[in-house]
Amino acid sequence: MSSDSLHTLGRWTSDRAVATPDRIAVDDRGVQLSYRALDARATALAEALGTAGFGIGDRIATITGNSSDQVALFFACAKAGVVLVPLSWRLSPAELASHLAASRPALLLVEDEFTSLADAACELLVDGPPRSTLGVGGIESHVPPIRREGMRESRPVRDDDPLLLIFTAGTLGTPKGAILSHANCFWTNLALSRTAELTSADVVLAVMPQYHVGGWNIQPLLAWWVGATVVLERTFDAGRVLQLIPDRKITTMMGVPANYLFLAEHPDFAATDLSTLRHAIVGGASMPEPLLRTWHARGVALTQGYGLTEASPNVLCLPDEDARTKVGLAGKPYPHVEVAVADPVTGEQFSGAATGELLVRGPSVFSGYFEQPEESASALRSGWLHTGDLVERDSDGYYRVIDRIKDIYISGGESIAPAEIESVLFGHPAVADAAVIGVPNARWGEVGVAFIVARRGVATDAEDLTAWLRERIARFKLPHGIRFVDSIPRSAADKILRRSLLADYLSHAPSNREPA
């Protein structure tokens, strides 16, 4: 590792083990791990991976909640040149199987809590990966030899070597694994450090799941770079978070607007001592003004912004001083990030105030999707990442996200592809046609509503279709409403006219909000 390139992340724990060996790196539900201990575990596991035949570019997938065991594995992978593929435990077995098939890991590590889920997913695979468990009682005590003829190239880890493979929703409902390199992660964390600074004195509360890019690159990795402490939580629970802030003296955290809404609505919010919480990051969507004011009234500074997995994810930043006067904006580009506004059809780039598709380039932009050259070529054109998001840039250079050109909507921070839900609905014998759209929701930002054209002579209702979906997709993807219609508006090319559906929905919804 000593000869690895300068921007490789395996160096980070080694450096901290020398600089602040006894500082707590991870507080995992009360079990604490110092930087010395974290680096020792990561180094030992990296060496064991190499001995077992794992090398540059090999992939290890995990199904686990946030844990110090996965943190140790992450840095072991960074030191060994192995790619970590953290998979979502919220997926259905069929969805999880598709992610495993798409990523082809050499090893799957499963936390005991998710054994049944992993079993069901692997049963759907023709040739599933070898399996083990995380932690000192599993992978750290024995690494199964990799199933491969010959050995991987033995060389130092380079900046451009892949480090993370994070799945993001595909526009056609197919899983897409975004490849993030060491350099991608280095540069996005460097940019974050210049806009939402952390020091070794900070205590970061991490509630974002580690199968999301934000679970790594929005605060936790920066914290481990500078020697701060990260308090890991398995899932978000408003009551527990309000206990942890004063108990652990949390100084900063990251969440989606729904997280901050649940906290503000909790009966203990007003009485909770938030004096240590100097700062919080908001991602996933813009924070509504009333909620923004609620947190400002409690003395918490809020940094908002915009990002996407393919950009590691940080693209636009709205610091607290701007957020107080520029409500609803996404901000300006992070340092080391270049953006442009272009015509979505012609690709012509506009100068000055303009509306168009947001393009991104810079060292934090990914290199492509794993083994999906066509999808990669579509996303990366002429050196620019085409986000598929429609933005408005004002004369002062501030950006506002006004619509998504692609159909994915975001609910509670989760990206959801309507086509995936539609394809499952089409499998129901009573469904003749279907369309799913995201509609505004005060609690979740957006929720899904399904429009159904029923087949004549086949009985069904909303409860029946919801039960059908619940067996086949993750719970967070379930539409919050199902409406039966005579027809689905479509273009001459048979494309669903989602904006027409949304306009019709909003014109007939009394509150313009689907219930939570």
Residue ranges and their predicted role:
Residues 225, 247-255, 264-325, 338:
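Gly/Ser/Thr-rich phosphate-binding loop
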Residues 306, 338-359, 395-396, 458-462, ...:
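Conserved beta-loop-beta connector loops within the AMP-binding
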Residues 316, 332-336, 348-379, 416:
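Conserved ATP/PPi-binding loop(s) of AMP-dependent carboxylate-activating enzymes
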Residues 186-203, 211-252, 266:
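Conserved AMP-binding/adenylation subdomain of ANL enzymes
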Residues 91, 362, 367-368, 375-378, ...:
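AMP-binding/adenylate-forming catalytic core of the ANL superfamily
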